[in-house]
Amino acid sequence: ASKRGGSKAAKSATGEKAVARKVSSLTLEQKVAQMFFPRPEALTGMGQVTAAGDTTRKAFANIPVGGMCYFSQNLQSESQARQMLSASNQISLDEVGLPLFMSVDEEGGTVSRVGGNKGFSVENVGNMRDVGDTGDARRAYDVCKKIAGYLVPLGFNLDFAPDADIVNGTSQTMAKRSFGTTADVVAPMVESAVKGFLDGGIMCCAKHFPGIGGAQGDSETEAIATDKTLDQLRQEELVPFERAIATGVPMVMVGHISCPKVTGDSAPASLSRAIVTDVLRGELGFDGIIITDSLGMGAVAGLHKARDLAVAAIRAGVDMLLMTPELTDSYQGVLDAVRDGTITEERIDESVTRIVRAKLAL
């Protein structure tokens, strides 16, 4: 498959030279740290982070992470959020000469950290299911451009949205968050959503690959699975992701759903080379950033020790590790794995090249 997706950065010869130069200027420790995407509390060891000062700077110097994911408890007002994000980004620029991915889960409706938050004069745009039910894909474009319009001035450069999941089972987890119940409805909505975010000047992330909308249960607390074959997934679940990739989505989040009829085992997609490397990178030709869903979720938490979880995800082919439990130990675990040859430095460089390419385009 031809390589598609990834940053809008023209992969010109000069652009790629700048990316390669930047990657080679980083130490192994810095490169591995760029693959981690914690909450600010996990980086700093504090109970609640609402500013970025000396504590953040010291913690970042120790582990210069590639991104931070913010939640409602971090966001009290527009001026506070702007200051915190601007200071956080400056720390990253000072330490590694790269901006920080600063993300939020702003899907609209039930999953919103800014819209409807009492500290912000921003209305919640509502659930994506209501948008999908209109049958008008322009609505998805308008809503996502509107979300970008209030996130960008605060300093966010990445939204963990849109949901490309199809609700084709009895799962309540995605019932309101997804655009609908068939690929015919969801795919054009996802395409328009991605365009809306990108035109609004923010990176976005299609999730939760290869689609968690039909699974029983909630991966937040428990293991979930699908008994579909790869052919069945190709007909429905994968279609919105293919459309997102064709539209230039810069990032895809892999969910914690087991696909035993595809992989032959019970490993969740986020830790499965068959799903991440063979299907998403290989068959779908996605060359942007692949990030895991939160590695603190119940679906994966009990499978490995924290450090082994991070190593397993990288070996599956992911580029970034979201909300890894025990950040310091996980980081050290990946460094140890590179030093003992379990993971090659070339493998780390592949991921960091994708991260740097996207960051230099911000």
Residue ranges and their predicted role:
Residues 30, 39, 72, 89-92, ...:
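Sec/Tat-exported extracytoplasmic proteins
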Residues 41-43, 47-49, 58-188, 208, ...:
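Enzymes and membrane/adaptor proteins characterized by extended Gly/Ser/Thr/Asp/Glu-rich
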Residues 47-52, 231-245, 271-276, 300-304:
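A general structural motif
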Residues 1-61, 282-283, 302-362:
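Preference for extracellular/luminal or secreted protein segments
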Residues 277-290, 294:
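Catalytic PLP-binding core of fold-type I/II PLP enzymes
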Residues 189-210, 229-249:
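Phosphate/pyrophosphate-binding betaalpha-module
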